C-alpha cells in the first residue's frame, strides 16, 4: 500500500474540528438539547475533541457517547477465534430520546457505517433529530446519506484508501490517501 499524499496535517485537522464545532453550535442555537455520539473507534476521539471545543465556545459541557455498531453492519466480519463478532459495547451516558444526536465519524464513504449507526441509535431511544459530522467525506455513496458537518471533502477513486491517524490511537494527527 503506497501513500500518495498527506491531505490533512495536525493543524488542518484542528482547524476543521474547530469550524465544525462552531457550525454545530450555530445550527442548533447552542447545545442544550444535543448529544455527541462517536462511532467506534476514531469517531469517539473526534467526538471528544468536538465536545472540548464546544465547551470552550459555549462555556458548558455537551454529553459524549460511544456507539459500537458491530452487530448492525450488513457486511459483518467475524474477527474472533470462535467466529463470533467482536463487540465492544456502546456507552451513551444520557437518554437520547427527544435529543438532537450528532453522530461523529472519521470518514464518510459508502454510507453503510452511518446506516448501521442509525439502526443502533434507534434501539437505544428515539432522538428528535440525527445529524452527522465527519472529518472526511470521500464520496462514493451507496446509500442516500449526507453529512451535515464536514471537515474536508476529499474526492477519491475507488482504487484509493483514506487513512485517518489520530493522536489517541496512532500517536499523530493526519489524513492520508493511499493506493489500494
Curated annotation (Swiss-Prot):
Keyword annotations: Glycosyltransferase, RNA-binding, Transcription, Transcription regulation, Transcription termination, Transferase
Short motif (PRPP-binding): ranges: 101-113
Superkingdom in the source lineage: Bacteria
Pfam families: Pribosyltran
GO annotation, biological process: DNA-templated transcription termination
Function comment: Regulates transcriptional attenuation of the pyrimidine nucleotide (pyr) operon by binding in a uridine-dependent manner to specific sites on pyr mRNA. This disrupts an antiterminator hairpin in the RNA and favors formation of a downstream transcription terminator, leading to a reduced expression of downstream genes.
PANTHER family, sorted: BIFUNCTIONAL PROTEIN PYRR (PTHR11608:SF0)
Protein name per its UniProtKB record: Bifunctional protein PyrR
UniProt organism field: Bacillus cereus (strain AH820)
Classification lineage: Bacteria, Bacillati, Bacillota, Bacilli, Bacillales
Gene of this entry: pyrR
Amino acid at each position: 500500500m503506497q501513500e500518495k499524499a498527506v491531505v490533512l496535517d495536525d493543524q488542518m485537522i484542528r482547524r476543521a474540528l474547530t469550524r465544525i464545532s462552531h457550525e454545530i453550535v450555530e445550527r442548533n442555537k447552542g447545545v442544550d438539547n444535543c448529544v455527541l455520539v462517536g462511532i467506534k473507534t476514531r469517531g469517539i476521539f473526534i467526538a471528544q475533541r468536538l465536545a472540548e471545543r464546544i465547551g470552550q465556545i459555549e462555556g458548558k459541557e455537551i454529553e459524549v457517547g460511544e456507539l459500537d455498531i458491530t452487530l448492525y453492519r450488513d457486511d459483518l466480519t467475524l474477527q474472533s477465534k470462535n467466529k463470533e463478532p467482536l463487540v465492544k459495547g456502546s456507552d451513551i451516558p444520557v437518554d437520547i430520546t427527544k435529543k438532537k444526536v450528532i453522530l461523529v465519524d472519521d470518514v464518510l464513504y459508502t454510507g453503510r457505517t452511518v446506516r448501521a449507526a442509525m439502526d443502533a441509535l434507534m434501539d437505544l431511544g428515539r432522538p428528535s433529530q440525527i445529524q452527522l459530522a465527519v472529518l472526511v467525506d470521500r464520496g462514493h455513496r451507496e446509500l442516500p446519506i449526507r453529512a451535515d458537518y464536514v471537515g474536508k471533502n476529499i474526492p477519491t477513486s475507488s482504487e484509493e484508501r483514506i487513512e485517518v491517524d489520530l493522536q489517541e490511537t496512532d500517536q499523530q494527527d493526519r489524513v492520508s490517501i493511499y493506493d489500494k
